[in-house]
Amino acid sequence: MNLYENRLEELKEEFNYKSKDIAKYFKANKSTYSEWEHNKIPIPTRRLIQFANFYKVNIDYILKLTDKKVNINKGTELDLKLIVERIKETRNKLNLSLRALGEKINCSFSAIASYERGEKLINSDILISLCKISNTSIDWILGRI
């Protein structure tokens, strides 16, 4: 399975949108949007939230981590404090140190520490890996459910 696999193209077609219109709406470069849509590059975490809010679905569904499509009608803003708490809770549930978690998800322990301190938003690649090893929903970690 491609780490970047997603349903952006499928959702776009379901709603009868064109790629150029979606790119324009989100103020994204058309070629960048195309790379996201065709699984060439990871979708940044902030964009994942925007796409999920736009299509009113769960991020886990967009990223093909589940086939269960959950309608989420309320738009969700980033709550970095909640995300920080949930990342820590997930790591603690796994009973792993920062270094051990980093080794499992191919991320430096210092990057994980900065995510846990709220210094920066967790990278989508790392978020996907964390959710896969912990069997946790991305939507839960990001405070959408």
Regions found by a protein language model. Name each.
Residues 1-16, 70-93:
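A short, Lys/Arg-rich alpha-helix, primarily the initiator
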Residues 9, 20, 49, 88, ...:
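Residues within the helices of the helix-turn-helix
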Residues 12, 23, 52, 91, ...:
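The alpha-helix within a helix-turn-helix
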Residues 13, 27, 38-40, 67, ...:
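Residue-level detection of the helix-turn-helix DNA-binding "recognition helix"
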Residues 16-35, 95-113:
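Short alpha-helical DNA-recognition segment
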Residues 46-61, 125-140:
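DNA major-groove recognition helix of helix-turn-helix/homeodomain DNA-binding modules
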Residues 61-71, 140-145:
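Short amphipathic recognition helices of helix-turn-helix/homeodomain-type DNA-binding modules
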